[in-house]
Amino acid sequence: MPRLILASTSPWRRALLEKLTIPFECAAPDVDETPMPGEAPRQLVLRLAQAKAQSLAARFPNHLIIGSDQICVLDGEITGKPLTEEKARQQLAKASGNIVTFYTGLALYNSASGQLQTEVEPFDVHFRHLSEAEIDDYVRKEHPLHCAGSFKSEGLGIALFERLEGRDPNTLIGLPLIALCQMLRREGFNPLQQ
């Protein structure tokens, strides 16, 4: 049975995969994440998830390699990580009262057989109307500077929302576990029987 590799250094993805209680290792993929000109959000996350998984095939030739990538879209524009408090406040002000869609690309690559499975999971976050004071307090308390969309749903960010819509709440954090379990079973790797 091939071993599992998570092609990520994200502590959030690692924590999500640990929920399945199956053994795995993490490895950093070497992938240029620059969008191609005119590339749609779904195509971008699908391409990057696939590239991350396949980039580790030479190092891990008999493994199931999991690649994932996520972007945040508001009003048709990709919203990246804010990196500064001012940018985080701007992103949250723009999201206030609106719907932000997260697209998470998932790829499972069997480096022994060359079999590749991919999927894109959308997840909608409906923001409630936020006051400037609420936005300031949230940014000060959570420091969401390295989070797409400027929030952490697994923390205080939940207080920003009116409702969430999607098949798998893990998708919002960065790794759609329901889809991943389906892919693993198709490879003969049932997480319940490991």
UniProtKB/Swiss-Prot annotation:
It is found in: Cytoplasm. Its EC number is 3.6.1.-. GO terms for biological process: nucleotide metabolic process. One of its GO terms (molecular function) is nucleoside triphosphate diphosphatase activity. The lineage of its organism: Bacteria, Pseudomonadati, Pseudomonadota, Gammaproteobacteria, Enterobacterales. Pfam families: Maf. The gene is yceF1. It is an enzyme of class 3 (hydrolase). The record marks W12, Q70, E154 as: Important for substrate specificity. Its cofactor is a divalent metal cation. It comes from Salmonella choleraesuis (strain SC-B67). The keyword Heme does not apply. Its main location: cytoplasm. It catalyses: N(7)-methyl-GTP + H2O = N(7)-methyl-GMP + diphosphate + H(+). GO terms for cellular component: cytoplasm. The active site is at D69. This is 7-methyl-GTP pyrophosphatase. InterPro entries: ITPase-like_fam (IPR029001), Maf-like (IPR003697).
